């Protein structure tokens, strides 16, 4: 009996001993040496990684940016008022990451992915690092699908493709954000028609250093138009600390990359990167990094290049997804040759240049067609659009050239007079109201009418009215034929010509009587 008990006891002991293990949880902690202006110097975190998230005793998070011999420079993601000298700082062991996934759509979050719209916690999300390496050359494919903005001036003259990076640059109050919002609104119809995820385009809007009222207004516009359901808004407003304004674009990019890497398409708008570079300059100077040109740190180019390189069109082997970037840069008095504007122009695949003078003259969107360019977009442009707007750019360029001389002389020859008349009408037809994007097939019809000379007899003042009436009376079958064919065949061309001819005659008859 005792013998049996002894054997049982020994096996029981053996089991217990094998199952016994000591799991030591080691927390590496440091102490705050000094704190101020959103920067904390911490002593004792010797094994910390660059870009690692830390937690202060008050619950505020921070990120290690400067790793020095004696101490670590940490930028604080929140208010530094609750942090004092001697406070304990804990390593989290993880690099800064944010929630990503389809559960983010329709939400407004801060730079760390925390919801700020009062709609409760996020659902069905995974986490992803904010700083990842951009896809390599082999993983990419050249841009070949169009990304429609719904703006006639952009889709015809500076077309954008899925996976492209197109800079929107201009002074303050020239309509930079309006172009970005119109692009988001234009995806509503495309997403509604899209049957699969490979056709839809999800949007991420990153607001950097903007007023809270501006962001609230944007949310209102998007939700009223039903565009919030396929959009994510990342907001690091003017009242947020500089580290959050610096981080927001990377967080938004990580959210967009989720779609890109899962065979879907996304568009990300950084509004604007000038404010991000100012926030980064502030952080760098406070971290005592040496200043360079315009007091920016030496790696301010890398700040933007590593962000914008993450926008890409993926190859078929890697899922054929894409991330299109529309960075916004604000210039001072139209100075495109300043440090940050030249940097971003050299990184992107083209720019849309907006001018104050054009804006006040009533040409809105105020795009300077001469200085705006799309370096890869023409490969992605619809063949039908390419066919109608081939001569548009040339005629506008000739018009600008002649218009300068026409101010001096009154007796102009017939050819010059023709160029002036045509140019004035083409300029007028490219004007468009805010928040009213036009589907690509309707744009094609309008530009076709303008380029083929049907507007030459119409008074300039009536052109907007002509355009509205034209789009109302066109046969929907003709529009759907353009969409399906993606090409203006001889049959479509003759139908368009007949329609424009008849419509122009009836329009003139009505308005001359």
Swiss-Prot record:
Gene3D superfamilies: 2.40.30.20, ATP synthase alpha/beta chain, C-terminal domain, P-loop containing nucleotide triphosphate hydrolases. Its main location: mitochondrion. Pfam families: ATP-synt_ab, ATP-synt_ab_C, ATP-synt_ab_N. It is found in: Mitochondrion; Mitochondrion inner membrane. Keywords: ATP synthesis, ATP-binding, CF(1), Hydrogen ion transport, Ion transport, Membrane, Mitochondrion, Mitochondrion inner membrane, Nucleotide-binding, Transport. One of its GO terms (molecular function) is ATP binding. ATP binds at residues 170-177. Belongs to the ATPase alpha/beta chains family. Mitochondrial membrane ATP synthase (F(1)F(0) ATP synthase or Complex V) produces ATP from ADP in the presence of a proton gradient across the membrane which is generated by electron transport complexes of the respiratory chain. F-type ATPases consist of two structural domains, F(1) - containing the extramembraneous catalytic core, and F(0) - containing the membrane proton channel, linked together by a central stalk and a peripheral stalk. During catalysis, ATP synthesis in the catalytic domain of F(1) is coupled via a rotary mechanism of the central stalk subunits to proton translocation. F-type ATPases have 2 components, CF(1) - the catalytic core - and CF(0) - the membrane proton channel. CF(1) has five subunits: alpha(3), beta(3), gamma(1), delta(1), epsilon(1). CF(0) has three main subunits: a, b and c. This is ATP synthase subunit alpha, mitochondrial. It comes from Marchantia polymorpha (Common liverwort).
